[in-house]
UniProtKB/Swiss-Prot annotation:
Name of protein: Phosphoglucosamine mutase
Cofactor binding notes: Binds 1 Mg(2+) ion per subunit.
Gene3D superfamilies, A to Z: Alpha-D-Glucose-1,6-Bisphosphate, subunit A, domain 3 (3.40.120.10), Alpha-D-phosphohexomutase, C-terminal domain (3.30.310.50)
Post-translational modification: Activated by phosphorylation.
Root EC class: isomerase
Gene behind the chain: glmM
Species annotation: Ligilactobacillus salivarius (strain UCC118)
Length: 450
């Protein structure tokens, strides 16, 4: 597809993602989503993160929606999972989030949720693409009766935090938490959430100015929170990303606890209480071998998917699992929400710490992360590279040397002409040797001479 990637439509604000395109997306997307709407007129929720281009794109998108007769409810600044939850709560026909998640400030994106709170299917996205690509706009253009209306729905934020508070059985009194809001969508919500739950908390990166979202902070820069946790003497730290769908934690010593470890800690806790469906956690191929070893030792099963939270959610829905996610901090608790939810993940983790009385460092120590190295190689043909006999031989040779105590993953990039060679092994030295052994063969066989 030309416009839609794995996470909606993305681009550089005011360039590849222009207000003109946002207007068209409002018209075409709104029209497709409301063909089968249960409400007449159709109702759509719209929200954005804190980046400066959000307001420009939001106004254009809303104009497009109104022009095809849609009743629009504006949430203002809200998290992506907040939109997914509120669409279901309000019985809306769709939700639209304007955000480029953890990307830098110049990027932005527009992603759609169906009435069930799940990201759109490929089929729906293809329908929207077809209308966007069409030479002429044949969609309705009412002049008076039949135009849409716009209402504020700022109380949605309170409803969302109240819902989050009900996902854990106890308050957080007696806990000292450090919070990094990435200067993004969670900035205005976290203080209310932790204050309501009685926690003692310190916040950083919760003053968005439109330009500082994700800038050296948040889940993609957890070292900032690690320093802050030690400085404040907190027992745990949680960092979110720009649109609040990721969470990375930090223990009391300033050590980073990634999505793999968070999934394990929460999954094991639920399993011991008979609440982890099929005793299974859904992971992606990028999860560390240390996670799988820890799961095996605790009689937990795993199901692997391609990289991307949408594939994790697909597998969870298809086979009835309730916990899954990615190393990057997208963790999905399907009992509560339909997508990765950073604040929800933080609460589940904090609840385990409180209920078990253990330190986060103790809980995370069960997953012994193996050193990992990733090399990207520019190739002439990424698909042919995977079928190349000499490359296959090199991979088999390395796997033989590992003898089950490590792993290799060779996969093409989804967006560029790159082959990604990743290995995990007991020591950094070993992992480097293994990666280079395969990378050298890839270079010799299919490399681009620059």
């Amino acid at each position: 597809m030309k416009y839609f990637g794995t996470d909606g439509v993305r681009g550089i604000a005011n360039e590849t993602l222009s207000p003109e395109l946002a207007f068209k997306l409002g018209r075409c997307g709104g029209y497709v989503l409301t063909q089968h709407a249960s409400n007449k007129p159709a109702r759509v929720l719209v929200a954005r993160d804190t980046r400066i281009s959000g307001q420009m794109l939001e106004q254009a998108l809303i104009a497009g929606l109104l022009s095809v007769g849609i009743e629009v409810f504006s949430l203002g600044v809200m998290t992506t999972p907040g939109v997914a939850y509120l669409v279901r709560l309000q019985d809306a026909d769709a939700g639209i989030m304007i955000s480029a998640s953890h990307n830098p400030v110049q990027d932005n994106g527009i992603k759609f949720f169906g009435s069930d709170g799940y990201k759109l299917s490929d089929e729906k996205e293809e329908e929207i693409e077809a209308l966007l690509e069409s030479d002429e706009d044949t969609l309705p253009r009412p002049s008076a009766e039949g135009l849409g209306t716009l209402s504020d729905y700022r109380e949605g934020a309170l409803k969302y935090t109240q819902f989050l508070e009900q996902t854990i059985p106890d308050d957080l009194e007696g806990m000292h938490i450090a919070v990094d809001g990435a200067n993004g969508s969670t900035s205005a919500l976290v203080s209310r959430l932790f204050a309501d739950l009685g926690a003692d908390f310190d916040t950083m990166a919760t003053n968005p100015d439109g330009l500082n979202i994700n800038k050296g902070v948040g889940s993609t820069h957890p070292e900032a929170l690690a320093k802050f946790v030690v400085e404040k003497g907190a027992q745990v730290g949680v960092a979110f990303d720009g649109d609040g769908d990721r969470c990375i934690a930090v223990d009391e010593n300033g050590e980073i606890v990634d999505g793999d470890k968070i999934m394990f800690i929460c999954g094991k806790y639920l399993s011991e209480r008979g609440r982890l469906k099929k005793d299974t956690i859904v992971t992606t191929v990028m999860s560390n071998i240390g996670l799988y070893k820890a799961m095996k030792e605790n009689n937990l099963n795993s199901v692997q998917t391609k990289v991307g939270d949408r594939y994790v959610v697909e597998a969870m829905r298809k086979d009835g699992y309730n916990v899954g996610g990615e190393q990057s901090g997208h963790v999905v608790f399907l009992d509560f929400n339909t997508t990765g939810d950073g604040m929800l993940t933080a609460l589940q983790l904090l609840n385990v710490i409180k209920q078990t009385g253990k330190k986060l460092s103790e809980l995370a120590a069960e997953v012994k992360t193996y050193p990992q190295e990733l090399v990207n190689i520019k190739v002439t043909d990424k698909k042919a590279a995977l079928d190349n006999e000499k490359i296959k031989e090199a991979i088999a040779k390395v796997e033989e040397k590992m003898a089950g105590d490590g792993r290799v993953l060779v996969r093409p990039s989804g967006t560029e002409d790159l082959l990604r060679v990743m290995a995990e092994a007991k020591t950094q030295e070993l992992v480097h040797d293994y990666v280079m052994e395969i990378a050298d063969v890839v270079e010799a066989e299919m490399g681009v001479n620059e």
